[in-house]
Amino acid sequence: MGISSSAPWLKYYDSTPAHLDYPKKTVYEMVRAAADKYPKNIAYEFMGKKTTFAEFMERIDRTAKAFLAMGIGRGDRVTICMPNCPQALDSFYALNRIGAVSNMILPLSAASEIKFYLDFSKSRAILTLDQFYGKVASVLPELENK
């Protein structure tokens, strides 16, 4: 079976390669490499505040140390229930740095959906903001994997 029959959309690709060879690195390692190369460049801007790669790496490293101090480590699953904000980014990359597995869910999910996601992922911990804590806390006693 040729590429055209298994992926017919490829015939519409002009100069776009059908396959990319990605480096064998974690997403944390990729961001770290960018930070090492461009420490003063802006990593992201949130609500008008610009954060450089150097600052971003400091935040990630501090967050990773905090996770380790809480006993979260390699292979642990952690749900991030936050909007798109710096704390979500810090947590995502910090968890990747220590070898934990993060899964991100929408904080506007219904309580029943949050329970489903936590049970399905077998998360060891969940991270959220105070605005969403009540909804998250309401499902904790019902979880299969406590």
Give a label for each model feature:
Residues M70, R97-K146:
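Structural core segment of the AMP-binding/adenylate-forming
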Residues S5, A35-K40:
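A short, compositionally biased
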Residues P17, A43, K49, A100, ...:
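A broad detector of the eukaryotic-type serine/threonine protein kinase catalytic domain
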